[in-house]
């Protein structure tokens, strides 16, 4: 006779997942202050919108949770994805990067480099990576954020 392994209730699993201590990336004191409903200091109004949407939808997340990734030539580095989210149904961690200055060519180059590193580490958009983006003329669309969260995190 087989024994069915116990599966933690979603609420307990999320509670334990959220309780993991970590040190995120520091934000310089002279930077503008943006705070989420949970009281986290984030880097932009758009990140407030994403964080508060995740919270409202009951999706557990960590802001700028450190992630060690391999670089070329046997090197590695610690990255701080904007959000590390937990899909409670699958128990998978999904990264969410928001690219908020896509009309700045230097920013775009750095974003492309980051995406290349993610892909080298097996983290692909639509699988373990959600990408949102905006420009000055095409700001963040809240409905799109909700749809992305629903599609990948529910």
Each model region followed by its residue ranges:
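Short, charged/polar micro-motifs that form catalytic or ligand-binding hotspots
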Residues: 36-44, 104, 108, 135
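Solvent-exposed, charged helical/coil patches
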Residues: 1-62
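C-terminal structured domain segments
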Residues: 102, 106-125, 136
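Short beta-strand-loop-alpha-helix junction that forms the active-site gateway
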Residues: 80-113
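Acidic-and-aromatic substrate-binding clefts and catalytic sites of carbohydrate-active enzymes
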Residues: 68-78, 104-105, 135-140
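Active-site metal-binding core of divalent-cation-utilizing nuclease and nuclease-like domains
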Residues: 40-42, 55, 60-90
């Amino acid at each position: 006779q087989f024994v069915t392994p116990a599966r933690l209730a979603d609420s307990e699993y999320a509670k334990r997942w959220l309780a993991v201590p970590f040190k995120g990336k520091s934000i310089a004191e002279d930077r503008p202050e943006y705070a989420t409903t949970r009281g986290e200091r984030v880097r932009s109004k758009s990140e407030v919108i994403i964080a508060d949407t995740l919270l409202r939808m009951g999706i557990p997340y960590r802001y700028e949770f450190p992630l060690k990734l391999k670089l070329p030539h046997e090197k590695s580095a610690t990255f701080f994805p904007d959000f590390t989210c937990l899909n409670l149904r699958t128990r998978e961690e999904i990264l969410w990067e928001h690219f908020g200055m896509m009309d700045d060519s230097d920013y775009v180059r750095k974003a492309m480099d980051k995406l290349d590193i993610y892909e080298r580490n097996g983290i692909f958009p639509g699988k373990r990576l959600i990408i949102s983006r905006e420009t000055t003329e095409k700001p963040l669309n809240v409905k799109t954020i909700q749809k992305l969260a629903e599609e990948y995190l529910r």
